[in-house]
Amino acid sequence: MSWLEKILEKSNIVSSRKASIPEGVWTKCTSCEQVLYHAELERNLEVCPKCNHHMRMKARRRLETFLDEGNRVELGGELEPQDKLKFKDSKRYKERIAAAQKSSGEKDALVAMKGELLGMPIVACAFEFSFMGGSMGSVVGARFVRAVEAAMENNCALVCFSASGGARMQEALMSLMQMAKTSAALERLSAKGLPFISVMTDPTMGGVSASLAMLGDINIGEPKALIGFAGRRVIEQTVREDLPEGFQRSEFLLEHGAIDMIVDRREMRQRVGGLIAKLTNHKSPLVVSVNDSPNEAAYSVPEANEKG
């Protein structure tokens, strides 16, 4: 064997030990496809640091990072969906509920909490899109109404983060009824002179967009969020026309007056807090003017629990 063959033979030795990387350490941006360190992405509130894409966020984590730490109380957490119609399509509704609860870690598609935002009392709720597409059923309607009632009892503002495909097909008329139920509850809130701020995230569609999501005193969209009633393809097939670029995105809706503003998720606490302070004439030392330089306390993000 020549000296060259000996060197090549040694270089082909492969270690039997494989480097193991724990699952979930790295993730990929769904927009620019950059590989991201998951802990960094979480610290950035699920916003890609490379392209600024706002990824979908878990409802519980959204509320825990939006509200101040401490004094957060969940509303309607004991409510669970019931299969009153014994509905079955390709699967039984009961089976779909069980699967959604296991995968999402939530009992239904809306989480509601009362707490404080920058020192001001507030009630907030958020849709869990991973639970059957954030669809609105009886429990979602009931929890939202409880949130409205809590806001009236505490004489404070209500904020809702929407992320939904619409009404829940498996609950039929009982699901559609929630559109009227939630709208009527918001009318009572308005009659008491309390503000409702609706934040529409990606996606907000169907019966949710046609009811509570568009009834805010101020309607906010996250950047590039899909917001509408029917899908683009359905509309194009109906009107037999090509729709413009960016149709149903929050930037398009802002340009055409359908929403009031677009707010980056990382600035949501301060911007919404500033709006609530003005609407309720509440003077909080943590609220600064939008035109002022942000202070560190106002923009700090509260810690979320492990479940979020």
Swiss-Prot record:
TM region positions: none
NCBIfam families: accD (TIGR00515)
Gene for this chain: accD
Family classification: Belongs to the AccD/PCCB family.
Cofactor(s) this protein cannot do without: Zn(2+)
UniProt source species: Vibrio vulnificus (strain YJ016)
Keyword set, alphabetical order: ATP-binding, Cytoplasm, Fatty acid biosynthesis, Fatty acid metabolism, Lipid biosynthesis, Lipid metabolism, Metal-binding, Nucleotide-binding, Transferase, Zinc, Zinc-finger
Reaction(s) catalysed (UniProt annotation): N(6)-carboxybiotinyl-L-lysyl-[protein] + acetyl-CoA = N(6)-biotinyl-L-lysyl-[protein] + malonyl-CoA
Protein's UniProt name: Acetyl-coenzyme A carboxylase carboxyl transferase subunit beta
Residues that hold Zn(2+) according to the record: 29, 32, 48, 51
Pfam families: Carboxyl_trans (PF01039), Zn_ribbon_ACC (PF17848)
PROSITE patterns per the UniProt record, alphabetical: COA_CT_NTER
Broad class of where this protein is predominantly found: cytoplasm
